[in-house]
């Protein structure tokens, strides 16, 4: 099981075939193994890899829970779902239609988040029945390990700095709000 980044040392972990994913896993101390999603089950079963980074869904839809008995939450990577629209299209809508569009976007986001949460809850129950143990971790040590990657990506792509700064600001505000809620 993985509780801290140190637990990853020497482990072979499947990642998506991208330089960023490989570097991230290397920074956490594991040996990154780029591999297609469909090969993971057999690779874990045969000991080619020790684990993989996937959502909970892989435990049941791909039956990874049959061969991988620990699932660690460290949030080293979070893939957001986005609703995207053409800016010219949006700006060309009459105010009443734009209001309807914005409301539909808000509602669809709420529905998607709720449906995802319900599906994950169901998947976790199924995975637990397969013998999978879910592990909550302190995410900060994992975050610290990958900070050099943030710096590398921003150095190579300076146009991303304002977007990165905006995301960090939003994240910090959310974390501050959570901290205040816990202290009340």
Language-model features, listed with the residues they occupy:
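N-terminal secretory/targeting leader peptides
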Residues: 1-184
């Amino acid at each position: 099981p993985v509780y801290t980044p140190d637990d990853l040392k020497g482990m072979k972990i499947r990642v998506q075939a991208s330089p960023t994913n490989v570097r991230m896993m290397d920074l956490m101390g594991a040996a990154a193994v780029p591999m297609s999603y469909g090969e993971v089950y057999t690779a874990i079963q045969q000991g080619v890899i020790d684990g993989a980074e996937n959502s909970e869904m892989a435990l049941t839809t791909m039956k990874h829970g049959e061969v991988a008995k620990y699932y660690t939450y460290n949030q080293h990577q979070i893939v957001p779902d986005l609703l995207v629209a053409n800016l010219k299209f949006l700006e060309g809508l009459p105010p009443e239609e734009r209001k309807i569009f914005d409301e539909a976007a808000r509602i669809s986001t709420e529905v998607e988040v709720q449906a995802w949460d319900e599906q994950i809850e169901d998947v976790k129950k199924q995975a637990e029945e397969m013998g999978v143990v879910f592990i909550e971790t302190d995410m900060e040590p994992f975050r610290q390990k990958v900070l050099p990657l943030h710096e590398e990506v921003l150095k190579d792509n300076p146009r991303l700095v304002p977007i990165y700064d905006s995301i960090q600001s939003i994240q910090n505000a959310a974390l501050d709000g959570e901290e205040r809620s816990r202290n009340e």
